[in-house]
Swiss-Prot record:
Organism for this UniProt entry: Salmonella typhimurium (strain LT2 / SGSC1412 / ATCC 700720)
One of the record's GO cellular component terms: cytoplasm
Family: Belongs to the LpxH family.
GO process annotations (BP): lipid A biosynthetic process
InterPro entries tied to this protein: Calcineurin-like_PHP_ApaH, LpxH-like, Metallo-depent_PP-like, UDP-diacylglucosamine_Hdrlase
Binding positions (substrate): N79, R80, D122, S160, N164, K167, H195
Bilayer topology annotation: Peripheral membrane protein
Protein name: UDP-2,3-diacylglucosamine hydrolase
Lineage of the species this protein comes from: Bacteria, Pseudomonadati, Pseudomonadota, Gammaproteobacteria, Enterobacterales
Keywords (A to Z) from UniProt: Cell inner membrane, Cell membrane, Hydrolase, Lipid A biosynthesis, Lipid biosynthesis, Lipid metabolism, Manganese, Membrane, Metal-binding
Catalytic class of the enzyme: hydrolase
Cofactors: Mn(2+)
Gene: lpxH
Length: 240
């Protein structure tokens, strides 16, 4: 019995080794799981479910194969793929979750999320996030021709990269008070998230009790997953 969590794969055709590693993960490790949760940024970018990118179709087929084998797959949107919609969910068999979800995992209440909402010290990013998560803005963007959406997405990624290069690492990490506030709001002692690309297990205090924040790593030179069993919560790095 095990439930698996991954995040921040940033899949793109320019990184075939990561794509191949994910396909192997779906075919091997994930097949033995009770469920798979993908906590955002599965893709490097997502400009709409109507994008004919062959990689998207390939990943939908692979995830659907996992689901059809009896392993449910759940997805929380990240900051790169927040426009993944019902069409891709239907094609892949994934179940879309809200940005915060509490799970009962073998007797543990665990809060899961992508993690970008915890980075409240980065006021510039939070303002940008509020704009692009506006439903009206999203509907307008999705009405644009694909070639225009691609240009806008490329410009936004370039702008984000430039902005991040001038920010301190502390600003781009989670805010400790926000973490505690979220855990106390949901009355949990466990939090699993991604986004920051800083894999670690942090011990803290919430609800006047010991608590734990487990951060998934990004898939670059190796894969990263959290494996939750009735007896343990493990952060695991593995070769791609």
């Amino acid at each position: 019995m095990a439930t698996l969590f991954i995040a921040d794969l940033h899949l793109q055709t320019e990184e075939p080794a990561i794509v191949a590693g994910f396909l192997r993960f779906l075919a091997v490790e994930a097949r033995q799981a009770d469920a798979l949760y993908i906590l955002g940024d599965l893709f490097e970018a997502w400009i709409g479910d109507d994008d004919p990118n062959p990689l998207h179709r390939e990943m939908a087929v692979a995830i659907k194969s996992l689901v059809d084998s009896g392993v449910p797959c759940f997805f929380i949107h990240g900051n790169r793929d927040f426009l993944i919609g019902k069409r891709f969910a239907r094609e892949s068999g994934m179940i879309l979750l809200p940005q915060e979800k509490v799970l009962d995992l073998y007797g543990r209440n665990v809060l899961i999320m992508h993690g970008d909402t915890l980075c409240t010290d980065d006021a510039g990013y939070q303002a940008f996030r509020a704009k692009v998560h506006n439903p009206w803005v999203q509907r307008l963007f999705l009405t644009l021709p694909l070639f225009i959406r691609r240009r806008i997405a490329a410009r936004m990624r370039a702008g984000s990269k430039a902005a991040n290069s001038s920010k301190s690492l502390d600003i781009m990490d989670v805010n400790a008070q926000t973490v505690v506030a979220e855990m106390e709001k949901h009355r949990v002692q466990w939090l699993i998230h991604g986004h920051t690309h800083r894999p670690a297990v942090h011990e803290l205090s919430a609800n006047d009790q010991p608590a734990f924040r487990v951060v998934l790593g990004a898939w670059h030179h190796e894969g990263s997953m959290v494996k939750v069993t009735p007896d343990n919560v493990e952060l695991i790095a593995f070769p791609l």
